[in-house]
Design a protein with these regions (language model features):
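Bacterial N-terminal signal peptides that target proteins for export
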Residues: 3-14
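Bacterial N-terminal signal peptides
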Residues: 15-24
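Bacterial Sec signal peptide processing site at the extreme N-terminus
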Residues: 27-43
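Non-catalytic, beta-strand-enriched accessory regions in extracellular/secretory proteins
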Residues: 69-93
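Noncatalytic modules at the cell exterior or secretory-pathway interfaces
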Residues: 95-98, 155-177
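Short amphipathic, basic-aromatic surface patches that mediate peripheral association
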Residues: 95-111
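Short coil-to-beta strand junction motifs in C2/discoidin
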Residues: 111-118
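Edge beta-strands of jelly-roll/beta-sandwich modules across compartments, strongly enriched
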Residues: 171-189, 197-216
Length: 218
């Protein structure tokens, strides 16, 4: 007897139960990351009290600076909302250059996933925030699948002396969408389970934690 076909054909409720459990676990994970940020203590009262290690410029083929924000990262209450952050000092020649951020979906499980959605705050030499252009976010994928990453490009303001990578309340209220994603989907056909290719949009909830690669082009 084929035990696998017995499960697929005779117990459709089992597949539905597993799907329900995955969805509950993913929602719980999203909620837990946000609750941890909400209750975390801020590191300092102003920008001047932050630590600013130097950030090096790289060529496109070089290894980027990897920023990983999690519940062990410092926290600050920005004007855009409370966030984990990573701060850097700019050296001579870096203001006015191009900044490229690269980040990818981070799965909680196969059915639901999220991604860290970065923004950048620039400070002048007096640790005062200065205006900058909006980040332009694009999805990059060779085969129109979930195997890809986002890029966010920006020009570093000429007056900038420091940069801070973090997120915002506005970002955390959003989803980043990918159009025309093709993936296999499991459906119920009578009492049987079938897998079919489906092309649709995919949405990724913005999270306060995750990893982003920072490329400051020299």
């Amino acid at each position: 007897m084929d035990n696998g076909s017995s499960v697929r054909g005779g117990r459709p409720w089992l597949a539905l139960l597993v799907i329900s459990m995955f969805l509950q676990a993913s929602c719980s994970s999203v909620s837990q990351t946000r609750d941890a940020l909400r209750t975390a203590e801020v590191c300092c009262d102003d920008f001047a009290a932050m630590s600013f290690p130097a950030i090096h410029s790289v060529n496109p083929s070089d290894t980027p600076v990897v920023v990983e924000l999690n519940d062990r990262s410092p926290v600050y209450s920005f004007s855009t909302g409370k966030s984990y952050f990573s701060a850097y000092a700019l050296s001579h020649g870096q203001p006015g250059s191009d900044l490229l951020l690269m980040f990818a979906p981070g799965r909680f499980n196969a059915l639901n996933s999220g991604t860290f959605c970065p923004i950048v705050t620039y400070l002048n030499s007096q640790h005062e925030p200065i205006a900058s252009e909006d980040l332009v976010i694009r999805w990059v994928s060779a085969d129109q699948s979930r195997s890809g990453y986002w890029t966010a490009a920006q020009t570093v303001p000429a007056a900038a002396s420091y940069l801070i990578v973090h997120t915002s309340d506005e970002m955390l209220s959003r989803q980043l969408s990918i159009d025309a994603v093709t993936e296999n989907q499991t459906i119920m056909v009578g009492y049987a389970v079938a897998t079919i290719p489906v092309t649709r949009a995919a949405g990724y909830q913005c999270l306060p934690v995750g990893e982003v690669q920072v490329i400051l082009l020299g």
